[in-house]
Amino acid sequence: MMKNNVDRIVSIVTALIMIFGASLFSPPIRVFADDTNINLVSNGDFESGTIDGWIKQGNPTLAVTTEQAIGQYSMKVTGRTQTYEGPAYSFLGKMQKGESYSVSLKVRLVSGQNSSNPLITVTMFREDDNGKHYDTIVWQKQVSEDSWTTVSGTYTLDYIGTLKTLYMYVESPDPTLEYYIDDVVVTTQNPIQVGNVIANETFENGNTSGWIGTGSSVVKAVYGVAHSGDYSLLTTGRTANWNGPSYDLTGKIVPGQQYNVDFWVKFVNGNDTEQIKATVKATSDKDNYIQVNDFANVNKGEWTEIKGSFTLPVADYSGISIYVESQNPTLEFYIDDFSVIGEISNNQITIQNDIPDLYSVFKDYFPIGVAVDPSRLNDADPHAQLTAKHFNMLVAENAMKPESLQPTEGNFTFDNADKIVDYAIAHNMKMRGHTLLWHNQVPDWFFQDPSDPSKSASRDLLLQRLKTHITTVLDHFKTKYGSQNPIIGWDVVNEVLDDNGNLRNSKWLQIIGPDYIEKAFEYAHEADPSMKLFINDYNIENNGVKTQAMYDLVKKLKSEGVPIDGIGMQMHININSNIDNIKASIEKLASLGVEIQVTELDMNMNGNISNEALLKQARLYKQLFDLFKAEKQYITAVVFWGVSDDVTWLSKPNAPLLFDSKLQAKPAFWAVVDPSKAIPDIQSAKALEGSPTIGANVDSSWKLVKPLYVNTYVEGTVGATATVKSMWDTKNLYLLVQVSDNTPSNNDGIEIFVDKNDDKSTSYETDDERYTIKRDGTGSSDITKYVTSNADGYVAQLAIPIEDISPAVNDKIGFDIRINDDKGNGKIDAITVWNDYTNSQNTNTSYFGDIVLSKSAQIATAIYGTPVIDGKVDDIWNNVEPISTNTWILGSNGATATQKMMWDDKYLYVLADVTDSNLNKSSINPYEQDSVEVFVDQNNDKTTYYENDDGQYRVNYDNEQSFGGSTNSNGFKSATSLTQSGYIVEEAIPWTSITPSNGTIIGFDLQVNNADENGKRTGIVTWCDPSGNSWQDTSGFGNLLLTGKPSGALKKGVTFDDIKNSWAKDAIEVLASRHIVEGMTDTQYEPNKTVTRAEFTAMILRLLNIKEEQYSGEFSDVNSGDWYANAIEAAYKAGIIEGDGKNARPNDSITREEMTQ
């Protein structure tokens, strides 16, 4: 073997010298001496008669046997009890990062098992600095006992930081399956090859395959002008230095290796001498530019050879390309005989042809489209192969925008656009046209006076240019392609609204006025009356101010007879986007009677591309497509903005699409296409410490708890969903399950799954439990339950015993829940879950979510009073206890605030004293300025979206106000003042949805934004919510208790309609007039409704003007964080309550009628 390796080295060196010459070896180039036929498994045939080198995954029995596929021996695997158990082999130190390997083994079942699930999976376990990963090599290959089955696949090693563990193991979804394995072979896939990585270097095929023009430039293979042969590549339409011919080298280059570049260039128009060079663009976490050669002088009319070289630093690159540029931004030039010679990467990208076609999965719902670049639409490019396999609609990412089609006035260039149309026709695809009008990527000449570019064009001239452009573009495709024209709709106008919902202050608006929008639609309809016409925009899926603005604009346009057929929702979302907001936005806009198309879908990872983030992304993609399917009556297309992560427009690092940078299916693909093959992310929710009472009335303490949402469908796409709140004490896990279900049936029900030790086992252990609760209250007898129906569905109050595990703060309990919905057909039509959307909860706890046992709720107090809103700290604020911002979302130091809260019958008052030594408001975005944001959820529903009662109020240090979402800002008041240490913000927030009273608890949070001297936001800190999503999600707000309204201010004539016959009428009216008790509404007291002993205690303190005191822990059923704890302490010290020795029984009930006596 040593002689063979030496011979191989000599032959490779000789070949390299013949190609490059001896000078190649200064600097030296890497040469591998690996024999690519070497099996990395040293004992893969077991002919040693041992299992040396093999280890156990789990605890199976491994033994050598004479039942063989080759030779005399094989390995027999028995004694399995878990699906993941089997033989394993370590490859740590044997495999190289970035290298691809072929994996093959032979498998046969031990006879006599009669398994109903005889499947084999081969998995690589990998642990690096980013955690533990399970990479599938072969997924559930069927095997038999009748013959040996070859199980084969490929594996490419990738990892982050240090690789700590790497081993391959053979498993089966049948936990007791027994089998033999033999002839295990793992080898590197490809030997080293050296050559030209440019496939179309001479253009003698007469096409531009692999080449594109960057920017506005257009490339074309031309006959009759060539350095050799008959063809060369001509570049025209350049408007910037960097515009020019570009070739994609992604997957073809080995970082760390030198590549020699050689090409010929010629021009015929321009100066006598021009300067030209080649540059490599390599994208990792940012775009890197590597110069191939200095600018070379090229003489007009002469073919000139240009040489250079480059070496990419070792890194992970999502995109690599080489392009030619000139210092003359409009120079047209030819190139020919282009070579980039060096080691050809073994990591050539191939797509997965054995997975479902994406568009076929949704063929009964809507077409699935993708934005493309014409350079990647040659059949040899794996991007084109991926496009053809998975999509049945195309849109041009840039090639149909104004600057691409008409870079100079009257000169239309359709070459790149036509390439996309031709590809669509050849592959039986439809197209969306994008876009006829935009404020970006439109040439300046559109807006300039032709005689003086420093002056603006007139309204009439700009309208004429707009009409000419729209008419020419639509007529081109209609005339050239006729009945074959695949374009079924156009984005007529794009992004005409700004972030605040106003018409964007573009040059179109400035010169023409707001009617430019309707004019564009009129011109398009006139040019092609059969074409569907769309208005397209971003951030209209948030159900906020921009959604409303789009609704109002389209409603107005339709009322004026403008021919608008649909709304394009770009849907550039992120992994924290709210599915309820997206649903509400779709339905709101669709109510206008227009089509809805999702036009630019991707999901920003916000810089986090960890495995956990990718699984979280998968869940949201699944929820999103379930929603799209449920809304299929409105949605007529769903289009992704890019085919794979390597071509995303988003800044790196990012992974926003269904296919990764190597064009392989991501977890999100499987979550959308076949959730049974997905790996769910593990969600986490907090259970707050507390002991709620279970009974006819829902305990008021539940108001303080953030819910989790049971809204991921595993059956159907429309049906019952739920919110779940959790609390705990040393005896029970308490659940409040509120089910939304408008099709009542006794077959409806809840299933609760609990893994007390949270060990995430793949089968049930003795600590694991499944409980059932029917809508009629029947079900598991070993838990406490109370079920009631209401107009929205039904509510279950549950207590699940956990005393046996001695629960403590920060412990975790594995948890999942399933909501079953029978819509009246006698069967379960829809099922939603919280965590495991593979729906394997009945047998597998590994995909349960986590319930974290946490301390009691965060709650602050606002006292009754009416300060003057003047930005000054009046004396009235002196008696208010402050709270502080100390929950960091961005950064870990910077501006912070202490804040105090007061209230009266009209307003909530907030005083924020901000410490900030460097004040800045230069950013155009209000949220990036030095400012204070107050978040209020008046009904404290803690929803993941904003309801009408919710608000986001922002005030910067200069008293400039701004508001988020659908905030009702009417009546809002603020004042600010500068201090030696920063600034003060004082606000009055009007009550719009509730009548406040003593004991009311609202959702509340406060955030401080900190800008640096350049206007960049560098710090965000809140009082409570750590998520950073308070602007769209109220579920993380803290709690604010309203107290202190005096009883002495008499209200005359107080009475209620429902106490006329009550024996306690007189007492109720007297106490209500003194604010000691309050009506449930202005006209209803509800005398028979119960109150808790805690609520009654608070009322008594108000009656006697007794101040609350810090709770000292006298009672076992009162926790220091409970809203009533300090009231209980004051009443206990005053002798008003005694308890029963250990318990105060704060949640025991009395009627509102009884408490007045």
Swiss-Prot record:
Gene transcribed to yield this protein: xynA
Report the protein name in the record.
Endo-1,4-beta-xylanase A
Which reaction(s) does its UniProt entry say it catalyses? Endohydrolysis of (1->4)-beta-D-xylosidic linkages in xylans
How does the activity vary with pH? Optimum pH is 5.5.
Q: What induces it?
A: By xylan and xylose.
- The lineage's top-level taxon is Bacteria
Q: Which UniProt keywords apply?
A: Carbohydrate metabolism, Glycosidase, Hydrolase, Polysaccharide degradation, Repeat, Signal, Xylan degradation
Query: Where does the signal sequence lie?
Result: 1-33
Ranges of residues in domain GH10: 352-675
Question: Where's the SLH domain?
Answer: 1051-1114, 1115-1157
EC number(s) per entry? 3.2.1.8
Q: Does the keyword Signal apply?
A: yes
Task: List the PROSITE patterns hit by this protein, alphabetically.
Answer: GH10_1, GH10_2, GLYCOSYL_HYDROL_F5, SLH
Give the family per the record: Belongs to the glycosyl hydrolase 10 (cellulase F) family.
Q: Which residues form the CBM-cenC domain?
A: 38-189, 195-343
